[in-house]
């Protein structure tokens, strides 16, 4: 079905809110407003300023070039025959010193979403043989296309503020679009994924954003805690930090069903405190594992190399002696910062490791 053309207000929004008018600044601090053509003086260190003649907010570019262009996407969300439609337009902006800027708006893609979450894509042809997934051929028609990864990469955060939603999306808690999230993925998740719907309805937008970015990966571990959070009216403001905090609690064996842990008053402070505890816990575990490995390998090393124990070479300054235990291998590796212990040289039957010292200070490790 052919959708109606955009009204002038929606077209004007794309030209004024999606692309940024440019102010070209020379080395003398003279800024040319490419929107109205007037020249004014401004040496601000900021990257933006307001033209005193036309009131346009300008993006300052310190350059000598005369031609400028921008290409951005604009999205409009509407409905048609009970289907949710996301219309994607390419906004092309061309400006030249001394001339009126030119704007073009071309519809390049439509995502049609059914109430059951299934969707299809109408799009123009794309040029092949380039490294860009959005080299649109404007002369081609909007036609039904096979779904490819490229269409999922084409989305924008510049969405026209007035949106129309199908009743099913409203029933699932949707009232607006989420910044930083592909709108198609967001709508489909609300229609098909109960967890996404729940997060939206309980007001956990940051958790929903994090959930969608990770495609729900590993959220089974967090879901019982999310229920506790919802029951206690706690709002997670930094979802990534909160999930990392729960991972630390889980590894430390804390109760993830307790509001005491999952609803911290100061998330950053509690996160940092438990990360310190976790690092200490991991170090103690590594020491225990290392000690167990040393005890396990000690007997075999003693049997294999006992006949060399006590062997040493020395003069007035240097002393070279055989390492007589696995624990000495560990101490040697730590002191000399090499892999004599970590690579298991004490297990090698065809090698003999010696340590060279001067006045008891290690200077070299020798392999025979």
Predicted regions and their residues:
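N-terminal alpha-helical interaction blocks
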Residues: 1-23
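Long, charge-rich boundary regions
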Residues: 63-137
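Catalytic-core elements of nucleic-acid end-processing and repair enzymes
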Residues: 174-177, 186-188, 192-368
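Cysteine-rich micro-motifs
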Residues: 44-60
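Cys/His-enriched microdomains
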Residues: 29-34, 47-52, 352
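Short, flexible, mixed-charge glycine/proline-rich loop motifs
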Residues: 16-30, 39-46
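Eukaryotic N-terminal intrinsically disordered, low-complexity segments enriched in Ser/Pro
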Residues: 18-22, 101, 109, 125-127, ...
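Intrinsically disordered, low-complexity regulatory segments
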Residues: 4, 21, 61-62, 69
């Amino acid at each position: 079905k052919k959708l109606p053309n955009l009204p002038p207000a929606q077209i004007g929004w794309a030209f004024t809110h999606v692309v940024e008018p440019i102010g070209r600044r020379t080395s003398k601090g003279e800024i040319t407003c490419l929107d109205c053509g007037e020249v004014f003086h401004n040496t601000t260190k900021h990257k933006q300023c307001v033209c005193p003649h036309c009131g346009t907010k300008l993006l300052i570019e310190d350059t000598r070039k005369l031609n400028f262009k921008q290409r951005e996407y604009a999205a409009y969300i509407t409905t048609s025959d009970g289907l949710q439609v996301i219309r994607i337009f390419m906004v092309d902006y061309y400006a030249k010193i001394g001339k009126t800027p030119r704007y073009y708006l071309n519809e390049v893609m439509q995502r049609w979403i059914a109430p059951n979450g299934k969707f299809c894509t109408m799009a123009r042809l794309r040029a092949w043989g380039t490294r860009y997934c959005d080299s649109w051929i404007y002369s081609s028609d909007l036609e039904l296309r096979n779904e490819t990864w490229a269409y999922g990469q084409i989305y924008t955060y510049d969405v026209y503020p007035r949106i129309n939603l199908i009743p099913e999306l409203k029933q699932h808690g949707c009232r607006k679009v989420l910044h930083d999230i592909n709108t198609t993925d967001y709508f489909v998740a609300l229609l098909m994924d109960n967890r996404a719907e729940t997060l939206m309805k309980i007001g956990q937008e940051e958790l929903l954003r994090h959930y969608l970015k990770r495609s729900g990966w590993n959220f089974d571990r967090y879901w019982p805690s999310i229920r506790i959070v919802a029951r206690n009216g706690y709002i997670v403001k930094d979802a990534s930090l909160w999930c990392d905090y729960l991972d630390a609690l889980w590894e430390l064996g804390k109760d993830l069903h307790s509001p005491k842990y999952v609803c911290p008053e100061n998330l950053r402070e509690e996160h940092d405190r438990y990360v310190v505890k976790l690092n200490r816990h991991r170090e103690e575990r590594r020491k225990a594992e290392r000690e167990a490995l040393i005890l396990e390998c000690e007997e075999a090393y003693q049997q294999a190399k006992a006949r060399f124990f006590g062997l040493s070479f020395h003069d007035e300054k240097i002393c070279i002696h055989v390492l007589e235990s696995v624990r000495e291998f560990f101490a040697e590796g730590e002191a000399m910062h090499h892999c004599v212990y970590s690579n298991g040289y004490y297990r090698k039957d065809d090698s003999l490791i010696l340590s060279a010292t001067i006045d008891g200070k290690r200077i070299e490790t020798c392999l025979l």
